[in-house]
Amino acid sequence: MTETPQVPPRRLLIALGSLVLILMVGGAVSFVRYARRHAPQPGLIAVAPFDIFAVGLDRWRVGLATALSERLNAPPLAAVPQTVVAATWRSAPRPEISAVELARQTGAGLAVYARVDSLPGKPDSVRVSLLAIDATTTKVLFGVLLRWPAADPEGLAARLAEHVRHNHPVRTFPP
């Protein structure tokens, strides 16, 4: 005697198919909600600690980042608090990449990385380089290169904030 394979009843197949469909739709909805909640905020800026390569200006490392964050933290922009930056920051051989990772971890749409270098033969001045990087695409949106008096870190923070506000994709005032 040969046995014929049992074919499941049609209702059972419909029920299993419906269950699979419901689970797929539920997973898709869950993913979309998660992605929307964790999308970078375009008006949020993560200012990484400055790299300081100028003798005697080590105090600027966090101080400049804090001052710049405070000046950028006004509508329509917002800055990630430096306490959060300190807890999240992970240095790497390429600090601009670390700045982008900082922005991604904090939900910021823009990463700001800057460095301060000594100028040969000019002990009273420094060269400041700033990069603003889109955290989603990792594209450099703009850069700033300044020569600045070493005795004026507050003025430097104000000037850099002005550059960031003026060039940020979320326009803060007409061009």
Predicted regions, residues:
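C-terminal/domain-edge helix-coil "capping" segments
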Residues: 2-20, 26-43, 121-125, 136-175
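Short beta-strand->alpha-helix linker/helix-N-cap micro-motif
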Residues: 40-126, 134-148
